[in-house]
């Protein structure tokens, strides 16, 4: 009986020693025993191919770009968000300016040190951010997920899905993408019968000039809205500009006016400028007063609101096809 008691005591001591060693190792790795038992929360790669391994659902997310700001606000409650970019407060650029008021911290300074000061457990950014900045944040121990800026409407959906997964909001992401697919299907149902060569040619303007490069996101927005992007037709690309004479030669059906300006320029003044410019006197868009404004909050969007832009574009140019539609947003 005594021998057996010694064995039990020694066995118990050994178990305690192993448990203590396990906890010590877990702490050394920056985790807890519960985390190790539960396994990984997320293992995968971001859109740039960098491996990301996470052990728990994030509670303090920082977003550094407007596109990721808008997706994050649509998927996560404010208490899960530590900070957003300063752009999200600009109602001239952001579809989510009102929702963003629930998140008090907005970052204009996106230096690694400023981001670190927010104590984030996840940082969302995009491929437009310099690689050196991303590397510096990772060197400080921050977990950075880089999301690729979409060049097509189809690319918006995996972007929402991947962000939803990395922040622990997969169900919300699935629900959002479901609504967006329905929105696109509705536009297609209303416009699919319009022959390609009869679809209106639209030319969009920023205050600085013609907007809408070939094979960029706005170009695809137009395609999904059953419109032809005149700037792309004339050859506008990242490396190639087009002249106003080329715009005139297209004889566009519609001019889309800008709504946002960092210098305070006004849409109505721009409208009058086009109307009174002798160069555009005989262009169909001016002759028939098809000078429309689709807010730049949609035209520049690289989030779920890019899909909403398709709806707004189609409804603006084809109002008679949406006469029964109240226009509730699918993206917010």
What are these regions (language model features)?
Residues 47-49, 102-113, 150, 235-244:
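Short helix-initiation/N-cap motifs at beta->coil->alpha
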Residues 60-118, 122-127, 227-230:
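A short, structured surface patch at a secondary-structure boundary
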Residues 105, 111-128, 142, 243-260:
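Proline-aspartate-enriched helix->loop->beta-strand connector
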Residues 126-127, 146-150, 233, 295:
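Short beta->alpha connector loops at strand-helix junctions that form conserved
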């Amino acid at each position: 009986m005594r021998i057996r008691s010694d064995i039990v005591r020694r066995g118990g001591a050994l178990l305690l020693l192993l448990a203590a060693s396990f906890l010590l190792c877990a702490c050394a790795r920056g985790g807890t025993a519960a985390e190790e038992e539960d396994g990984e929360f997320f293992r995968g790669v971001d859109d740039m191919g960098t491996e990301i391994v996470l052990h728990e659902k994030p509670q303090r997310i920082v977003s550094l770009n407007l596109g990721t700001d808008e997706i994050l606000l649509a998927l996560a409650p404010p208490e899960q968000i530590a900070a957003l970019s300063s752009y999200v407060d600009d109602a001239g650029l952001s579809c989510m300016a009102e929702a963003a008021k629930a998140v008090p911290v907005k970052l204009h300074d996106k230096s690694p040190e400023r981001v670190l000061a927010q104590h984030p457990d996840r940082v969302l950014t995009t491929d437009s951010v310099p690689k050196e900045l991303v590397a510096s944040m990772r060197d400080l121990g921050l977990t950075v997920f880089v999301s690729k800026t979409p060049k097509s409407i189809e690319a918006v959906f995996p972007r929402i899905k991947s962000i939803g997964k990395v922040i622990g909001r997969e169900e919300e992401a699935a629900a959002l993408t479901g609504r967006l697919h329905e929105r696109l299907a509705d536009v297609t149902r209303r416009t699919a019968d319009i022959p390609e060569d009869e679809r209106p040619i639209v030319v969009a303007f920023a205050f600085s000039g013609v907007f809408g490069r070939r094979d960029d996101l706005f170009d695809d927005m137009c395609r999904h809205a059953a419109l032809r992007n005149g700037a792309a037709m004339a050859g506008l690309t990242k490396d190639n500009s087009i002249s106003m004479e080329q715009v005139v030669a297209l004889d566009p059906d519609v001019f889309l006016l800008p709504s946002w300006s960092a210098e305070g320029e006004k849409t109505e003044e721009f409208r009058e400028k086009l109307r009174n410019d002798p160069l555009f006197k005989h262009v169909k868009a001016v002759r028939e007063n098809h000078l429309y404004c689709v807010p730049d909050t949609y035209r520049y969007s690289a989030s779920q609101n890019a899909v909403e832009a398709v709806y707004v574009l189609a409804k603006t140019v084809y109002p008679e096809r949406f006469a029964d539609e109240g226009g509730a947003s699918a993206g917010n």
